[in-house]
């Protein structure tokens, strides 16, 4: 990033996150726009012999994260070289996407207090798109994972008298089936 000519680099945000800033030809608008990419190394061995192979045994940038990071470095190089925009570009290199906590940890560490961006654009590869094209959408575009906890509590009973109790296992099974069918039967997975 230093070689790209960015104006500032702050590392250690959320422990291992990094943010680079690039000022446009003018900053009169005061706008700050974020570009974000994930940069997780995953705990798996890399069994290839490429020049860019991971230097850390048992860790590799799988799942396209190396591509995401490379795209954001490419954006940094272009934006720093041209500066053909008004405001400040904030390049967010986010760790911990796979663990679902990297963004939260960066925010808790003051990411948006230090860099009060008006909008953020996430970058993600999409192998089925034609090379050299960009996919855009108004609103949500990619799927996301989330975790929920549902606790089922009921009046227990004896196995010989199930009619006198509420079978929490059966209730939980029905909830599981109903929640699974929301996406599988009622919504498109990409909505």
Regions found by a protein language model. Give the residues of each.
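Histidine/acidic-residue-rich, glycine-tolerant segments that coordinate divalent metal ions
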Residues: 18, 42-44, 48-60, 66-67, ...
């Amino acid at each position: 990033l230093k070689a790209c000519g960015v104006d500032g680099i702050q590392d250690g945000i959320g422990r291992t996150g990094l943010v680079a800033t690039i000022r446009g030809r003018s900053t009169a608008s005061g706008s700050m726009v974020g570009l974000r990419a994930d940069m997780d190394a995953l705990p798996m061995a890399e069994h290839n012999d490429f020049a860019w192979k991971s230097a850390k045994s048992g860790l590799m940038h799988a799942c396209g994260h190396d591509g995401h990071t490379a795209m954001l470095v490419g954006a940094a190089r272009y934006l720093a070289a041209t500066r053909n925009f008004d405001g400040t570009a904030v390049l967010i290199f986010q760790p911990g996407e796979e663990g679902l906590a990297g963004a939260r940890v960066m925010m808790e560490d003051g990411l948006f207090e230090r860099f009060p961006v008006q909008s953020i654009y996430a970058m993600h590869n999409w192998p089925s798109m034609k090379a050299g094209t960009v996919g855009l959408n108004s609103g949500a575009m990619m799927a996301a994972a989330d975790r929920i906890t549902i606790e089922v509590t009921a009046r227990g009973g004896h196995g010989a008298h199930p009619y006198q109790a509420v079978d929490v296992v059966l209730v939980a099974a029905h909830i599981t089936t109903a929640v699974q069918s929301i996406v599988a039967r009622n919504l498109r997975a990409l909505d």
